[in-house]
Swiss-Prot record:
Pathway listed: Protein modification; protein ubiquitination
Gene3D superfamilies documented for this protein: Zinc/RING finger domain, C3HC4 (zinc finger) (3.30.40.10)
Protein name, UniProt field: E3 ubiquitin-protein ligase RNF220
PANTHER family (alphabetical): E3 UBIQUITIN-PROTEIN LIGASE RNF220, E3 UBIQUITIN-PROTEIN LIGASE RNF220 ISOFORM X1
Any Pfam family the entry gives: RNF220
RING-type zinc finger segments: 514-553
Keywords attached to this entry: Coiled coil, Cytoplasm, Isopeptide bond, Metal-binding, Phosphoprotein, Transferase, Ubl conjugation, Ubl conjugation pathway, Zinc, Zinc-finger
Keyword flag Iron-sulfur: no
Organism: Bos taurus (Bovine)
Assembly, per entry: Interacts with SIN3B. Interacts with CTNNB1 (via Armadillo repeats 2-8). Interacts with USP7 (via MATH domain).
Region (Required for targeting to the cytoplasm) location: 514-522
Modified residues (Phosphoserine): 390
Length: 566
């Protein structure tokens, strides 16, 4: 058998960009030529370097001599009927390019074309390339792998021929066994399957396929959605019945708890704790779900329930108080309305049929027969009954004694005005006497000390003398007592007091002046009605003419005047 002609084609080598550097050379047998006649003598390969036979030692591209290919790969035994007497490492057929010698062209080595993807068969087209899965993703099962009785194997050699095993023939037929054995032999030669799989019987392969299928289905084992327990197919019916029984027992247990909680005399705190515990319990609780129980009975969830219950209790208490207030108000309104209705009914009954006697005969007043009496007939009538909303508590004058003290002036202190006609003067005097009730008039201000003394009666003396007298009277202070001619010391002290008063007036600059007499205040008074300030004489003379403030015309009585100090 020519092992070199089909094994090496250096012209199409994809792993030797440079000329051959190493003197070592490997000669391998292809799978396609493995089925040929072994009696054909081996031919020498084309001269591309130093020819090396199969019997020579293979060059190992590792520095350590003890690290051999035998330690990396196990030698494969001979396959009956193909390579009985050959002793070469068949595991080198699927050696990865990184571990191959640098001068070896592995392009046409049977189905293991390293120009593609190393130890796998060459990609014929894009569809074949896409059909293979990545080494980092789970392997996909073929459609025919679900049927353990019909194994499906595909194989392609270096020439592009594909072999399909187990597609048409059943596994029990001898033809299928023959094809399966042939495929196993080819895969054994190529090194893709182990000796145990190649030499195993069809029954062993079927058992292994069933185990693989069971292992695959174990990853998809059913899980109970309630208690999260892995179940076997034989346990599904029993577990479902158990869950249904637990579900039927839940309402009965809750009803018993509610009946116990609603028993008379149960405190609200116990009811609240029972409700919190009932809400905290999971409806899907089971002895197998300890993780879910811990989650639902966590401290955080219990705190949330307690806070929510306390908040609802406070809100309910407020609502209850509001309802009680509304009920009390409604009862009060109802009682008031009932009393009013009863009073109206009594009043109507008392006045419905009014009887009176006339000429010894009892008669019924016709107006009482009308509904509403005179009011119903359109007449306006005054009720003889006193109105409860009278003005008895209304104080029109007001009592300012507590706030402003006792009155300091009365009607007797008012200075009456003198009219030009004697008739008017008499009328004023009579009116004043009636107001005073025969009391004596006040001597608070005498004509001698009055600012307005020059206005009383016209003088018959010289004008100069009258002016001088007026000046003297104007400049006189009311606080200074009448000075006698004999007391010189008293006169001296009075003059000093007057000088000091004038100095104070000059120092103030006459900032405060009465708006009536346009002079400095001799004795300022204010009214508690409008709080305007005038001289005492100005106030009393104004109130003698009219009971109004001379500045704002507010009604003012003598009792409203109060003394102030500037």
């Amino acid at each position: 058998m020519d092992l070199h002609r089909a094994a090496f084609k250096m012209e199409n080598s994809s792993y030797l960009p440079n000329p051959l550097a190493s003197p070592a050379l490997m000669v391998l047998a292809s799978t396609a030529e493995a089925s040929r006649d072994a009696s054909i003598p081996c031919q020498q390969p084309r001269p591309f370097g130093v020819p090396v036979s199969v019997d020579k030692d293979v060059h190992i591209p590792f520095t350590n001599g003890s690290y051999t290919f035998a330690s990396m790969y196990h030698r494969q035994g001979g396959v009956p009927g193909t390579f009985a007497n050959r002793d070469f490492p068949p595991s080198l057929l699927h050696l990865h390019p990184q571990f191959a010698p640098p001068n070896l062209d592995c392009t046409p080595i049977s189905m293991l074309n390293h120009s593609g993807v190393g130890a796998f068969r060459p990609f014929a087209s894009t569809e074949d390339r896409e059909s293979y899965q990545s080494a980092f993703t789970p392997a996909k099962r073929l459609k025919n792998c679900h049927d353990t009785e019909s194994p499906h194997l595909r194989f392609s050699d270096a020439d592009g021929k594909e072999y399909d095993f187990g597609t048409q023939l059943p596994s029990s037929s001898p033809g299928s066994l023959k094809v399966d054995d042939t495929g196993k032999k080819i895969f054994a030669v190529s090194g893709l399957i182990s000796d145990r799989e190649a030499s195993s019987s069809p029954e062993d392969r079927n058992d292994r396929c069933k185990k693989k299928a069971a292992a695959l289905f174990d990853s998809q084992a059913p899980i109970c959605p309630i208690c999260q327990v892995l179940l076997r197919p034989s346990e599904l019916q029993e577990h479902m019945e158990q869950e249904l029984e637990q579900l039927a027992q839940l309402p009965a247990s809750k009803n018993s708890l509610l009946k116990d909680a609603m028993a008379p005399g149960t405190p609200k705190s116990l009811l609240l704790s029972a409700s919190i515990k009932r809400e905290g319990e999971s409806p899907t609780a089971s002895p197998h779900s300890s993780a879910t129980d811990d989650l639902h009975h966590s401290d955080r969830y219990q705190t949330f329930l307690r806070v929510r219950a306390n908040r609802q209790t406070r809100l309910n208490a407020r609502i209850g108080k509001m309802k009680r207030r509304k009920q009390d108000e409604g009862q009060r309104e109802g009682s008031c309305m009932a009393e009013d209705d009863a009073a109206d009914i009594e009043h109507e009954n008392s006045n419905r049929f009014e009887e009176y006697e006339w000429c010894g005969q009892k008669r019924i007043r016709a107006t009482t027969l009308l509904e509403g009496g005179f009011r119903g007939s359109g007449f306006v009538m005054c009720s003889g009954k006193e109105n409860p909303d009278s003005d008895a508590d209304l104080d029109v004058d007001g009592d300012d004694t507590l706030e402003y003290g006792k009155p300091q002036y009365t009607e007797a202190d008012v200075i009456p005005c003198t009219g030009e006609e004697p008739g008017e003067a008499k009328e004023r005097e009579a009116l004043r006497g009636a107001v005073l009730n025969g009391g004596p008039p006040s001597t608070r201000i005498t004509p001698e000390f009055s600012k307005w003394a020059s206005d009383e009666m016209p003088s018959t003396s010289n004008g100069e003398s009258s002016k001088q007298e007026a000046m003297q009277k104007t400049c006189k202070n009311s606080d200074i007592e009448k000075i006698t001619e004999d007391s010189a010391v008293t006169t001296f002290e009075a003059l000093k007091a007057r000088v000091r008063e004038l100095e104070r007036q000059l120092s103030r600059g006459d900032r405060y002046k009465c708006l009536i007499c346009m002079d400095s205040y001799s004795m300022p008074l204010t009214s508690i009605q409008c709080w305007h300030v005038h001289c005492e004489e100005c106030w009393l003379r104004t109130l003698g003419a009219k009971k109004l403030c001379p500045q704002c015309y507010t009604i003012t009585a003598p009792g409203d005047l109060r003394r102030i100090y500037l």
